[in-house]
Amino acid sequence: MNKLYIGNLNESVTPADLEKVFNDHKISFSGQFLVKSGYAFVDCPDEQWAMKAIETFSGKVELHGKQLEIEHSVPKKQRSRKIQIRNIPPQLRWEVLDGLLAQYGTVENCEQVNTDSETAVVNVTYTNREQTRQAIMKLNGHQLENHVLKVSYIPDEQSVQGPENGRRGGFGARGAPRQGSPVTAGAPVKQQPVDIPLRLLVPTQYVGAIIGKEGATIRNITKQTQSKIDVHRKENAGAAEKAISIHSTPEGCSAACKMILEIMQKEAKDTKTADEVPLKILAHNNFVGRLIGKEGRNLKKVEQDTETKITISSLQDLTLYNPERTITVKGSIENCCKAEQEIMKKVREAYENDVAAMSLQSHLIPGLNLAAVGLFPASSNAVPPPPSSVSGAAPYSSFMPPEQETVHVFIPAQAVGAIIGKKGQHIKQLSRFASASIKIAPPETPDSKVRMVVITGPPEAQFKAQGRIYGKLKEENFFGPKEEVKLETHIRVPASAAGRVIGKGGKTVNELQNLTAAEVVVPRDQTPDENEQVIVKIIGHFYASQMAQRKIRDILAQVKQQHQKGQSGQLQARRK
């Protein structure tokens, strides 16, 4: 995406005029300007320079009496499903943006683009061309919180080689390789290991000391700790603090962290700018609840064990542009480093659990995109994309409709209004987004403290709908800033299969709880309903609940399969 289209040009504009404008604004370009009648093309060295040119010039700079309009140059064949939305208010919440995008179709992917501008930029992929066309028509020029959105196509490489072009690919409709293809027939595909970086926030005045003369200090740190360190100097120009990302083993990250802390402490002492420099760790909000623990127990234990004082920034500071919380640790350098190890250990555990759940969802729900669901904002480096291939047979065949599931989710009674929205707008939008039926059951008693949300739809719809409900409750502050959203969910299982969910001596249900971190209860002495089904209760945070639900469905599928095999065997025996 390095090639730019420059529109709204005066007929008299020459390549030299454009070169001068780019040079005056210190925008790098490569090659010659190709000037046509009223428009031109030029290449930039990379995508970052292209974005900088768009932000600097488009609708802001005049040339020969006309305002330049600059966007990515996209060949007609590649104008398909991908668009870029610019000038998004930085404080805008994902929920609002997702709702706006969902009005024009199903969003497959929504990822944030790192830029130097104060406003946010996202790249969006819709399911088909028509949805994308509608989104451009309606969103370009749309006013949102005093910001006018700018929308344009970006290249969709898949459109050139995809089914819309009439070429047969080796992949099915959902992107999974066909069974028997070389990918699935051989050994399992190795997943690229994805590290979770240690991200620090450091005062801007100490960045120079950390880098050192001609980069000597930071080179020494990377060499000694076997790490890769990125100092994000250009982001948030003028900010009092800058982010540093450290990529290495946990031990390497901790060693680099200690060296950086020592450098900052020395610099503060030499310049007499501060008595102490606290350690500030950035962690994605998805992991912070589990770091804090129930009633703050995990965090208190870390404080006690390391003799430090730890505070975490407010949820109110989270925006579309900033999905991370700041964890501030105060104490001696030695103790701060011990706290860093404990904090990152908890964060990595939460990450691994979520990836396990995500991997499971990717296997059971091919094509599921978590960024589109809005649970893992794509700006987060902490979450890898779903596996590109799934070995073995798919749980349900691509030509068979996925099985409908009904799940009961219990929410605080006072949250019903937020889930329904004004004139029912939010629940309708949620239903469309997830492709699920979502209904709120009447209260069991006038003073009920919880209400039941009945969600009916296939696995992917369940994942999306439940994920949004968890997110909405957190966003609307129905749970405290240090409290993780944990909900009770009920699924019905055949009474004959309840024993398989429990296992001998409760072994299966105990393993299920250990694996998923959810509380799973099969109440004893239940009377089966008219369909000979009983309730299984699941209590936990979103990923724990999802993983438990999918594992239980997996057990039920095995029971059903064995039952069908048994019936088939009996039938064959009778024929003989």
Swiss-Prot record:
The keyword Magnesium does not apply. Residues 195-260, 276-343, 404-469, 486-552 form the KH domain. Residues 2-75, 81-156 form the RRM domain. The keyword DNA damage does not apply. The modification Phosphotyrosine is found at residue 396. GO terms for molecular function: mRNA 3'-UTR binding; mRNA binding; N6-methyladenosine-containing RNA reader activity. One of its GO terms (cellular component) is lamellipodium. Changing residue 294 to E: Decrease in Y RNA binding. Only small decrease in affinity for binding to ACTB and MYC transcripts, some accumulation in the nucleus, and complete loss of formation of higher ordered protein-RNA complexes. Phosphorylated by SRC at Tyr-396. This residue is involved in ACTB mRNA binding, its phosphorylation impairs association with ACTB mRNA and hence abolishes translational repression. Phosphorylation occurs in close proximity to filopodia and in the growth cones of differentiated neuroglioblastoma cells. One of its GO terms (biological process) is positive regulation of neuron projection development. Residues 158-189 are annotated as: Disordered. Keywords: Cell projection, Cytoplasm, mRNA transport, Nucleus, Phosphoprotein, Repeat, RNA-binding, Translation regulation, Transport. Belongs to the RRM IMP/VICKZ family. Expressed in neurons and embryonic fibroblasts (at protein level). RNA-binding factor that recruits target transcripts to cytoplasmic protein-RNA complexes (mRNPs). This transcript 'caging' into mRNPs allows mRNA transport and transient storage. It also modulates the rate and location at which target transcripts encounter the translational apparatus and shields them from endonuclease attacks or microRNA-mediated degradation. Preferentially binds to N6-methyladenosine (m6A)-containing mRNAs and increases their stability. Plays a direct role in the transport and translation of transcripts required for axonal regeneration in adult sensory neurons. SUPFAM superfamilies: Eukaryotic type KH-domain (KH-domain type I), RNA-binding domain, RBD. InterPro entries: IGF2BP1_RRM1, IGF2BP1_RRM2, KH_dom, KH_dom_type_1, KH_dom_type_1_sf, Nucleotide-bd_a/b_plait_sf, RBD_domain_sf, RRM_dom. Changing residue 396 to Q: Impairs the interaction with beta-actin mRNA and its translation repression. Gene3D superfamilies: 3.30.310.210, 3.30.70.330, K Homology domain, type 1. Domains KH3 and KH4 are the major RNA-binding modules, although KH1 and KH2 may also contribute to transcript binding. The contribution to RNA-binding of individual KH domains may be target-specific. KH1 and KH2, and possibly KH3 and KH4, promote the formation of higher ordered protein-RNA complexes, which may be essential for IGF2BP1 cytoplasmic retention. KH domains are required for RNA-dependent homo- and heterooligomerization and for localization to stress granules. KH3 and KH4 mediate association with the cytoskeleton. It comes from Gallus gallus. Disulfide bonds: none annotated. Pfam families: KH_1 (PF00013), RRM_1 (PF00076). It comes from the Eukaryota. This is Insulin-like growth factor 2 mRNA-binding protein 1. SMART domains: KH (SM00322), RRM (SM00360). It is found in: Nucleus; Cytoplasm; Cytoplasm, Perinuclear region; Cytoplasm, P-body.
